[in-house]
Amino acid sequence: MANKKKPLKKQKIRNSEYYDMQLVLDELYAASVKGQRFCNLVELIKHPENIKLAYRNIRKNSGSRTACVDNKTISDLNKWNENALVAHVQRKLDWYIPNAVRRVEIPKDNGKTRPLGIPTIMDRLIQQCILQVLEPICEAKFFKRSNGFRPNHSAENAIAQAERMIQNVGCHYVIDIDIKSFFDNVNHGKLLKQMWTLGIRDKKLLSIISTMLKAEVAGIGFPEKGTPQGGIISPLLSNIVLNELDWWIVSQWEEMPTQRNYVHRIYANGTPDKSSTIRTLRNYTNLKECYVVRYADDFKIFCKKRSDAVKLFEATKQWLLERLGLETSPEKSKIVNLKRHYSEFLGFKLKVRTKGKKPDGQPRYVIEAHIKDKALLKIRKKSKEIIGQIRQTYDPGMEYRLIQTYNSYVMGVHNYYSIATHVNPDFHKIAFDVKKSLYNRLKHRLQKSGQITNRYIKEKYGTSREVRYLNGHAIVPIAYVQHRVPMDKKSRVNKYTPEGRAEIHKNLAGINMAVLYHLMNNPCGKQSVEYNDNRIALYVAQKGKCAVSGVELEANQVDCHHKKPLVLGGNDSYQNLIIVSDVVHILIHSSNERTIRKYLKVLNPDKKQLAKLNKLRVLAEMPELVF
């Protein structure tokens, strides 16, 4: 094997490469871009490598441990022989009949509940098999400003797009439309027709999806409409439904054909410069200038004129009802003048304010983004709840875990809401109440001095005078947060092209904050406080990468290994621990030849990686491996 350093990769992309599926998925994407039709997808879905990839992708997903009506979880699938599991999935797909779906009611902030439909673990595996094949086909057809439930898209991208429309384009009228119970009212027949239009012409696959949609809900019956939230494939199906809405709105302005075909130069970030086309549409047509930004079923339409917004508001409601059979909520749907009122979007509230004047003497408007009022109240309530839990325990281990839970929660909301322009004053509104709760409940145990062992907390919060310590553990100050500019997704980023994947890997140089929060919030219960603290410190020090393979790790793959095992006299010190992937950890300790061969094939180490692996095996008093 070559000694060339392997690039940093997202784990699902690596999984695809392990099972030789990435090239196939790339070809599906490229064919979909060209408008080709797909008539034999079931055979690809049933391919053994696709099934193995699906199993790996769901194996350590936190939801895989949730039981359904058959009381089975991923641990039951783990007992299957690999070939037997593949054969069983293939047989089920030959004549697919889904099991009943377990219905769970999740409480919402407004006091109501959101129904979740949880399929059995075997049905989830089959849905993952289908998702892997359908996703590249659909990704080629989806609109660029559709952000929810899509690879490499996020809420931050949606906020960045909305702010660009408001501040840069000057769209100060926003159409807010709320779809009544969207997920419960999706028309099954319409959805299947939309899939057919996207080029998915495999009738057997469409029949399987139709059967999935009509799966019995335990205790309720067989649904006639809707996509059950909780299913692996449901987010993709919901995007297929609303993709037609995206392109209908885009066709009203951005994609309106002109008599002259303009040649668009490409910006450095990969997006085309359409200024010539837009200028022509503004000067020579009476079309309504409008732009849509969507995140799942939450979408905004931005307009420059109120008269345009009024017409589009009525047209969109009518189109949703007649075309998709979806009703809108008259109480929540409205037109907002951003110069006077706020428009709420994804936990933020957006408005514009004047700041100086333009060269022509007209007022210059800039974005003003706050945390939504309900979100602030929720943050305050949750923070005080965790502080109350810390107050009620005097067990050092439990106290440490709760402090980590509090810190990860505060860091998480800081990270999400830091893109609000007024994030600092917003957090100061609740900081007094939270700090008062902290001092009143823990005043005799809090200290102002101490040492921060978590490197990330030290780098981000170490200069704050508001950091407090409880038995030597730092508590993150809730008001210590700064604004950062929201970033849109680069158009080149794409998990289904080699160039797009290279861009993804290039952007993964920092620490994955979601994984860090997970580690802080989920310490190893059977391990010491020292072990858990060093586990987090090592994850940060190693930049979230496996010490052997150099691969960035997902939360479910981070293993903290004792170089010298405890049974051989090792300890939980920083020097005796190292972060490795779950696959590497198995290879360090395994003595079973079959297991070793299996996971060496998965890891596929080069000479340097094998040398690192063998060094750890020697320290654990295991024989060296040959590959």
Task: Cite the ranges covered by each PLM segment.
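Non-catalytic, polymerase-adjacent accessory regions of viral genome-replication enzymes
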Residues: 1-83
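Conserved polymerase palm-domain catalytic core
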Residues: 85, 93, 100, 141-145, ...
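Histidine-centered nuclease catalytic patch
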Residues: 178, 550-582, 590-596
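A conserved non-catalytic segment of reverse transcriptases
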Residues: 214, 219, 324-395, 410-411
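Non-catalytic, peripheral interaction segments enriched in hydrophobic/basic residues
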Residues: 391, 398-461
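Extended C-terminal regions of large enzymes
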Residues: 430-433, 440-526
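Short cysteine-rich loop/turn motifs with clustered Cys
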Residues: 528-559, 581-583
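Polybasic, low-complexity binding patches
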Residues: 567-575, 587-627
